[in-house]
Design a protein with these regions (language model features):
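Sec-dependent N-terminal signal peptides
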Residues: 4-14
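Short, surface-exposed alpha-helical segments at coil->helix boundaries
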Residues: 36-40
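Short N-terminal segments immediately surrounding and downstream of signal-peptide cleavage
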Residues: 22-34
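Generic anion/oxyanion-binding catalytic loop in active/binding sites
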Residues: 9, 28, 71
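Sec/Tat signal peptide C-region and signal peptidase I cleavage site
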Residues: 16-20
């Protein structure tokens, strides 16, 4: 879980525009109480540094539903700026 947080922070700060303040859309499945609270820490830090965080939460399936949503966004040519994804799952996107 710590690796996921570090990956999200890294993506948040490297996937943004520097012209009008960083803006990021994050697809994730952290929707339960404790998960949402942990994600709020990242959101608040990003906002405190002038960023605009746009949530794309996907509930259910322990990330499986989020992976389906991510694939659909990629195929449609509208991927989010960052996505919470399990390490081995990213390899599936390379095969398509």
């Amino acid at each position: 879980m710590k690796k996921i947080i570090i990956a999200l922070i890294t993506l948040a700060f490297t996937s943004t525009s520097s012209i009008a303040g960083p803006k990021i859309e994050v697809l994730h499945w952290w929707t339960s109480g404790g998960e949402a609270a942990a994600l709020k820490v990242l959101k608040d830090d990003f906002a405190a540094n002038g960023g605009e965080w746009m949530d794309m939460p996907v509930t259910g399936g322990g990330g499986d539903a989020a992976n389906v949503a991510l694939k659909a966004r990629i195929v449609a040519g509208d991927p989010p700026s960052a996505s919470q994804i399990k390490g081995p799952t990213i390899q599936e996107h390379d095969q398509e």
